[in-house]
Amino acid sequence: MNLQRLSVFGTDNIGVYIYTNNKYTIIPRGLDSETKENIAQVLGTELLEAEISRSFLLGIFISGNDNGILLPKSTIDDEFRFLKENLRDCRVEILNSKVTALGNTILANNKAALIYPEFNDIEEKIIKETLGVEDIKRGKIAQMITVGSVGVITNKGGLVHVDTSEKELKELEKLFGVKIDIGTVNFGSVFIKSGLVANDKGTLVGASTTGPEILRIQKALGE
């Protein structure tokens, strides 16, 4: 597995700004060419420069997998059209929900999704259909309802909040169909998503992520 440390706009919270699946990586405009080349090389995807809700916080607003991409209702028409036209083999839908931080509230791979407990039945149905997952479940991770913020799951493995119990880990492994471990990023942060961007081909970690954290991440994501 390719793994590289990265900073974006002077911060190690790279997952706030970047969304990836195995086909596309959506990045904010304004990154230098070297950073863009590194991202594309490590993740092995096509890069798209975009905004959501006139913001560069793409990792916060976007959730998805290889089948589909979900955008918040605050997405502006031209932003939606751009992604719809360029994400050619992904379904792209707007989730009409009061919840807009979809990256923080939906945790998914190609098999399953764990979602924010307060999504309603209609929202759950749209999420399931758009992502094309077999299983979907509302729940928490380590008592955190923002499940997307405290985990990263690929089709090869996953890393979640360090306080996740053994029972929870087993339930998550059954749901997603992969081995999952606990850990931290960026020198002790439990908000895994903020410091980790990964797909089945590669991994980017925040620049302050330590050697021991990286070893744990590599093991968890199936290297």
UniProtKB/Swiss-Prot annotation:
Modified in an unknown fashion (not phosphorylation) following release from 50S ribosomal subunits. Keywords: Initiation factor, Protein biosynthesis, RNA-binding, rRNA-binding, Stress response. GO terms for cellular component: cytosol. InterPro entries: eIF6. Induction: Constitutively expressed, further induced by cold (60) or heat (90 degrees Celsius) shock (at protein level). GO terms for biological process: assembly of large subunit precursor of preribosome; cytosolic ribosome assembly; maturation of 5.8S rRNA; maturation of LSU-rRNA. Disulfide bonds: none annotated. One of its GO terms (molecular function) is ribosome binding. Binds to the 50S ribosomal subunit and prevents its association with the 30S ribosomal subunit to form the 70S initiation complex. Inhibits translation of both leadered and leaderless mRNAs, maybe by binding to the 50S ribosome subunit, preventing it from binding to the 30S subunit. Associates with the 50S ribosomal subunit, specifically with protein L14. Binds to 23S rRNA, possibly between where the 30S and 50S subunits associate to initiate translation. Belongs to the eIF-6 family. This is Translation initiation factor 6. The gene is eif6.
